Swiss-Prot record:
Pfam families: RRF (PF01765). Keywords: Cytoplasm, Protein biosynthesis. It comes from the Bacteria. Its main location: cytoplasm. This is Ribosome-recycling factor. The lineage of its organism: Bacteria, Bacillati, Bacillota, Clostridia, Eubacteriales. It is found in: Cytoplasm. One of its GO terms (molecular function) is ribosomal large subunit binding. GO terms for biological process: translational termination. Responsible for the release of ribosomes from messenger RNA at the termination of protein biosynthesis. May increase the efficiency of translation by recycling ribosomes from one round of translation to another.
Length: 185
C-alpha cells in the first residue's frame, strides 16, 4: 500500500514536470518555435479548434513561423486568432500562407520573460510540495489504519522526500536552461 502511494506521488510529479515543460515551450524566447502557437484556437465551422488541427505550423527560419491552413477560408480566422492572442505577433498573409516574424527581444522584454519563467517554475515547485504533503498525509493515515510502525512511516516519508528533492532539482535545471535561452542574444 505504501508503494502505491509513493508510486502515485511519483507519477503526479512527473506529470507536473511535463506540464512545466509544456508551459515553458509556449513562452517566446526570440526564436521561432511552433509550440508558441499551441494555445491559439481558431473558429472552425462554429466550434473552436486548436490551430494545429486546422493548419500546418513550421519554422523555416530561426525567427519565422509559417502557417499553412488546410482550407483557404481559414486564413482570415487564423489571422484574427493570432491578433487576439497575447503573443504580440503580427501575421502577414500572401493569400495561401501566413508568416509570423518573431521580433528580437528587448532587454526589458527578456527581464519580464525571465520573471515569468521563474514564476512558472515556482508554481511547479508549489505543486510538487502539495503532492508530497498529500502522499505524507496518506502514509500517516495508513499508520492508524494498518498499524504501521514509526520506522516504516519514517522510511516511507524519507523516500517521498528523496523523490521530491530530485524533482525540485530537475525543475531548477529546467528553469535555469530556459533562463539561459531567454537571456542569450
Amino acid at each position: 500500500m505504501i508503494k502505491d502511494i509513493i508510486q502515485n506521488a511519483e507519477e503526479k510529479m512527473k506529470k507536473t514536470i511535463s506540464v512545466l515543460k509544456s508551459d515553458l515551450s509556449t513562452m517566446k524566447a526570440g526564436r521561432a518555435n511552433p509550440t508558441m502557437l499551441d494555445r491559439i484556437h481558431v473558429e472552425y465551422y462554429g466550434s473552436m479548434c486548436p490551430l494545429s488541427q486546422v493548419a500546418n505550423v513550421s519554422a523555416p527560419e530561426p525567427r519565422v513561423l509559417m502557417i499553412t491552413p488546410w482550407e483557404k477560408p481559414l486564413l482570415k480566422e487564423i489571422e484574427k486568432a493570432i491578433l487576439k492572442s497575447d503573443l504580440g505577433l503580427n501575421p502577414s498573409s500572401d493569400g495561401s500562407i501566413i508568416r509570423l516574424v518573431i521580433p528580437e527581444l528587448t532587454e526589458e522584454t527578456r527581464k519580464t520573460l525571465v520573471k515569468n519563467v521563474k514564476k512558472t517554475g515556482e508554481e511547479a515547485k508549489v505543486a510538487i510540495r502539495s503532492i508530497r504533503k498529500t502522499a505524507n498525509d496518506k502514509i500517516k493515515a495508513l499508520k492508524k489504519d494498518e498499524d504501521l510502525s514509526e520506522d516504516q512511516v519514517k522510511k516511507a516519508e524519507d523516500e517521498v522526500q528523496k523523490k521530491t528533492d530530485a524533482v525540485v532539482k530537475e525543475i531548477d535545471s529546467i528553469i535555469a536552461a530556459k533562463e539561459k535561452e531567454v537571456l542569450s542574444v
